[in-house]
């Protein structure tokens, strides 16, 4: 049902309040488009909730085994490093399917993208369950299931910006993008919190996988019923005709300000992926239990969700994009440095909890802002182009970082054995190296921001002048 109508400008023919897309109705020159009434629908909330649900279960699938690395290793009769590879394999699988998101959304729409996510999730989860059954315990089958889940992830993680532009006005886009996007790390938080309690012993592993697979099966059902876009667009930005894929990619590749955002975005996403994957191994050598390590991971994500919930509505209203980035990215960098020392603190696990809370709050506060800025910079191209490229970089760098940081684990003769001090130092250095780039965005190109709003205002002025 329609819950709100946004009226901008006046038709000179009938006097009806409408928002014009392109020139005035009096302009019969090339490129004339009929005016379109801009409308938003209540069903958009169902759509964003379902997209969030898909991101929750796909991320929960990613961290299923790394959340309980020792228990998983004992059950599958493999090393802890092999369990880490279940996470790494998922990230590499993401990179295989990510390039297909562009054509999928263009040809099948958001509904088609969600359906592909759902089918792959269904198949991947139940293959994992088959590999984890007590009679089988086959690491290869489990890895195959993880890879299929990884193939599903880009079809729901790269599309929130597209969904928010298709269904929401500029007063709600940042919040909608945040809800759907940050549901992905929420799924990882659920895994960090719940899995140590669902699988307290190796014999509990089949039951844990059965529960996760059942929840995922229920979560995918609405994919087949939610449409790709509303009957009428919510804003002029959503109504713009998009350029072809190859033209868009060539144009985006030439935008310096795009790379100033996209590359740091990819690096910071990769650092989060490696941190959430290796956090257990970073704190356990200092005496923490798997449950305490899981709580640390949950705090990392939970505090981030709180930060995003506070700042996303404020950014929708006040557009504090650059202020948010300049305030919170340096804090994020400082917390990666603090994480080097927190696990070894004589105060136990509590300093790690504090660092994880601040790191999560600052990281997640900037994530939806960065995605919205990417959509602004790449406009009038489709929003999923910038987000897919950036998420692709985050996943592939994340996989590389996990491999590199796993190789930096200290040996059995270290104090304490198998500590990850050098791995955490590696992450801190990377966060510092890529910090300056996004802070320089408006200095390099002052017109990079709010281009959709500028185009929107220009359209209204054209309509009024013609009237």
Language-model regions, residue ranges each:
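Glycine-rich segments within core transmembrane alpha-helices of 12-TM secondary carriers
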Residues: 172-200, 216, 391-402
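C-terminal transmembrane helical hairpin of 12-TM major facilitator-type secondary transporters
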Residues: 319-370
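Symmetry-related core transmembrane helices of the 12-TM Major Facilitator Superfamily/SLC fold
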Residues: 206-225, 421-440
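Extracytoplasmic gate region of multi-pass secondary transporters
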Residues: 65-66, 255-311, 401-402
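Helix-to-loop junctions at the C-terminal end of transmembrane segments
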Residues: 96-112, 306-320
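Cytoplasmic helix-loop-helix junction between adjacent transmembrane helices
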Residues: 143-183
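Cytosolic juxtamembrane N-terminal segment immediately preceding the first transmembrane helix
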Residues: 2-60, 65, 74
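Juxtamembrane intracellular "pre-TM" segments in multi-pass secondary transporters
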Residues: 30-41, 232-261, 458-467
């Amino acid at each position: 049902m329609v819950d709100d109508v946004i009226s901008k400008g006046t038709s000179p023919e009938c006097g009806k309040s409408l928002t014009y897309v392109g020139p005035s109705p009096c302009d019969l020159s090339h490129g004339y488009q009929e005016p379109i009434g801009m409308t938003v629908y209540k069903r958009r909330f169902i759509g964003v909730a379902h997209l969030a649900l898909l991101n929750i279960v796909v991320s929960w699938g990613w961290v299923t085994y790394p959340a309980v690395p020792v228990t998983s290793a004992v059950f599958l009769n493999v090393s802890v490093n092999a369990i880490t590879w279940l996470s790494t394999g998922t990230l590499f699988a993401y990179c295989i399917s990510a390039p297909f998101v562009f054509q999928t959304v263009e040809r099948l729409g958001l509904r088609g993208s969600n359906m592909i996510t759902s089918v792959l999730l269904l198949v991947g989860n139940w293959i994992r369950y088959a590999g984890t059954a007590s009679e089988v315990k086959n690491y290869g089958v489990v890895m195959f299931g993880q890879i299929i889940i990884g193939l599903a992830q880009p079809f729901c993680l790269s599309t929130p910006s597209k969904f928010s532009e298709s269904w929401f006005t500029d007063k709600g886009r940042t919040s909608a993008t945040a809800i759907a996007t940050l549901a992905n790390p929420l799924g990882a938080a659920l895994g960090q919190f719940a899995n140590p309690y669902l699988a307290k012993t190796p014999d509990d592993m089949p039951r844990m996988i059965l529960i996760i697979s059942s929840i995922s099966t229920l979560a995918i059902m609405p994919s087949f019923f939610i449409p790709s876009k509303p009957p009428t667009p919510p804003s002029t930005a959503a109504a713009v005709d998009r350029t072809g894929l190859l033209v868009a990619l060539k144009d985006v590749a030439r935008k310096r300000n795009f790379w100033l955002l996209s590359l740091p975005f990819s690096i910071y996403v990769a650092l989060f992926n490696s941190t959430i994957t290796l956090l257990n191994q970073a704190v356990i050598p200092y005496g923490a239990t798997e449950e305490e390590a899981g709580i640390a991971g949950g705090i990392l994500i939970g505090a981030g969700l709180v930060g995003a919930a506070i700042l996303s509505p404020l950014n929708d209203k006040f557009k504090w994009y650059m202020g948010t980035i300049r305030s919170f990215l340096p804090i994020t960098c400082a917390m990666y440095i603090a994480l080097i020392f927190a696990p070894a603190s004589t105060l136990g696990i509590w300093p790690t909890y504090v660092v994880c809370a601040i790191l999560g709050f600052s990281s997640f506060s900037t994530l939806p802002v960065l995605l919205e800025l990417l959509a602004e910079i790449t406009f009038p191209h489709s929003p999923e182009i910038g987000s897919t490229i950036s998420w692709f970089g985050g996943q592939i760098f994340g996989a590389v970082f996990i491999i590199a940081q796993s190789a930096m684990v200290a040996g059995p003769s270290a104090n304490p054995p198998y500590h990850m001090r050098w791995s955490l130092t590696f992450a801190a250095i990377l966060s510092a190296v890529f910090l300056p780039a996004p802070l320089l965005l408006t200095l390099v190109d002052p017109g990079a921001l709010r281009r959709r709003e500028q185009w929107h205002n220009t359209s209204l002025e054209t309509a009024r002048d013609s009237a």
